[in-house]
């Protein structure tokens, strides 16, 4: 049955990030890739807007693949090669989070996960690659960097190079029912998300610590841009606040959800830490009036302005930026904190 361009665009708009249009076109590997990456982080989904006509045309001439000589190879695609590396690293990171506690993880689990990510991208569209050689390259590379998380990158690079070397067009296959295709895609999706969900829920403390450290490092980048930092904090805390609106207050019944509430408090505490640091920088006590804050700010700006400290420009500039950031924090209207 011929595929319609209009229907493809409708499915792209309604469920593009989860690959509905690819399922419609029979591109199951591409659909699975979009499910696991939410449309390539949204960028791949948007970029496909201009590619959909070629996807539809390709789906409608599937039978022409039979006429391709076996020795014919698809043209080299730098985009596909780069995507293989990125997705391989992504699969490796997910495996590192969810499966690193298993025995021989760096010998078996990590190269297998990275290799499968590379093969998934290699199988997008009408192309594929050699399964054994690609996984073999991943397994042969992993012992060189045994026990190091950085091994994800060289393993992905080696597997991607091998997959490109053995790229080929897919052989023609008989048509399958939609239920069979969905069953296969669903199993693959569960195989990816199941271990990750298990690790997240049953190793809550470790997950919380890791997320908290990551958020702490991330938020520290905005120390000199308080307004932008507050915006980022609001975005990070938005899911928790939506949950509170739904349940009627900041209370979680499950002990595991209480751990996530602690994460909320951790992120929310950055505002207090910034206020304390701002008071220290300006040399004013907590509860200082706006006049005291402004007076201290003017005095410090005169002292540390770079134009007045040409003999120590770098230090003066650093202090000047700290003073500006601290004043911006303290000059904002005080908001009552949630109890």
UniProtKB/Swiss-Prot annotation:
Nucleus as UniProt keyword: no
This protein's GO CC annotations: membrane
SUPFAM superfamilies tied to this protein: Chaperone J-domain
Localization per Swiss-Prot or TrEMBL: Membrane
Listed Pfam families: DnaJ (PF00226), TM2 (PF05154)
Domain J: 277-339
Gene3D superfamilies, alphabetized: DnaJ domain (1.10.287.110)
PANTHER family in UniProt: DNAJ HOMOLOG SUBFAMILY C MEMBER 22
Protein name per the record: DnaJ homolog subfamily C member 22
């Amino acid at each position: 049955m011929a595929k319609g361009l209009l229907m493809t665009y409708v499915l792209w708009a309604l469920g593009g990030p989860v690959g509905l249009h690819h399922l419609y076109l029979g591109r199951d590997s591409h659909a699975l890739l979009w499910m696991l990456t939410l449309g390539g982080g949204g960028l791949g989904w948007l970029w496909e807007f201009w590619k959909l006509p070629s996807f539809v045309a390709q789906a409608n001439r599937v039978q022409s693949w039979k006429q391709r000589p076996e020795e014919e190879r698809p043209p080299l695609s730098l985009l596909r090669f780069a995507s293989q590396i990125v997705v391989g690293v992504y699969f490796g990171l997910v495996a590192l989070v969810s499966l690193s506690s298993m025995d021989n993880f760096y010998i078996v689990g990590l190269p297998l996960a990275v290799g499968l990510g590379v093969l998934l991208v290699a199988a997008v569209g009408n192309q594929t690659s050699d399964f054994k050689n690609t996984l073999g390259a991943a397994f042969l590379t992993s012992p060189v960097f045994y026990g190091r998380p950085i091994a994800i990158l060289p393993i992905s690079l080696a597997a991607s190079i091998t997959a490109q070397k053995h790229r080929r067009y897919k052989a023609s296959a008989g048509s399958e029912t939609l239920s069979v295709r969905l069953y296969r895609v669903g199993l693959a999706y569960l195989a990816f998300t199941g271990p990750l969900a298990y690790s997240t829920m049953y190793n809550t403390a470790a997950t919380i610590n890791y997320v908290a450290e990551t958020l702490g490092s991330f938020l520290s980048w905005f120390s000199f841009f308080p307004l932008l930092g507050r915006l980022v904090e609001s975005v990070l805390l938005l899911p928790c606040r939506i949950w509170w609106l739904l349940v009627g207050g900041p209370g979680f019944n499950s002990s595991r959800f209480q751990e996530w509430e602690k994460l909320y408090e951790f992120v929310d505490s950055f505002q207090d830490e910034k206020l304390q640091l701002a008071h220290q920088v300006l040399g004013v006590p907590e509860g200082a009036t706006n006049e005291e804050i402004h007076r201290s700010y003017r005095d410090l700006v005169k002292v540390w302005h770079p134009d007045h400290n040409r003999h120590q420009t770098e230090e003066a500039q650093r202090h000047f930026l700290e003073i500006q950031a601290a004043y911006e924090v303290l000059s904002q209207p005080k908001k009552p904190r949630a109890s």
